[in-house]
């Protein structure tokens, strides 16, 4: 199989990841729940992984990195823990439902004000709209770093400057960029960075988290066992315990730690360069095929390793099925949990076929994918 669905999850991971998970299952106890060897090993692994993530994202404090099951949970924690009745938030048409649905629910249930920066037919935003939508009660701007549909990358540093100039926080969904595009929380002005472990970070599914700037207060979304202060009625308020009620996925975190070793040794810039080259090769190979429409801004200097397209008026699911059944190529059709972006692109009925690349793909695989698109378009 030629796997080109890396924006959904990376299938091909460093072999160290699986080995680390198996070893953890054989040796680890429960982190912060005891002083025996197994519990201490789990605690060391968890904290060591926090330190690696802090280094990767330039997060000021490792103890302000909170583990979750995925970026959806991380975003729910951040959005629900920061926005309250009377607050206002700004988001964009570029968002995944993991941002949209928590915001919609707060709009309905807490009366949180909500405005969106619209995207054009190429999925681009006007940064002046962020400034125009700011209100006196704007508490946060919540936005993705990279659209999971178009691959367009937002200028997070520019958005962060606008947010902070008006006293608002910046919450960033880094699901599509963590591990594949350099992220510096300090330089970009990110207050809360939400990430998942199973995509560009090449870790196991069931891992993710938040990186929180010191001074940012997030109310606990869930409370319960913490391993410390057990006689207190309330959840401990220090990070990361404040937001980590219950047993952590230490086995998955061990796998994530192994993946981070590979990324930190290789360098995110090197991974980005390779993935960009594969993406660009595919784009150049399909953009002029008769009947093919490609979505997104390919003139931008920085973008995710994503190419989304349609072939004539063919249903996107039918095209994706043909790619899988006739060519052994895995892609993602449909709506991609990005309804506002599909409306901006005019693809709500047809959907679109997304090709997404990783550093484990090859140029030969890209050439096979180009050939497949050309042949389907000729039918």
Model-derived features with residue positions:
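Pyridoxal 5′-phosphate
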Residues: 1-379
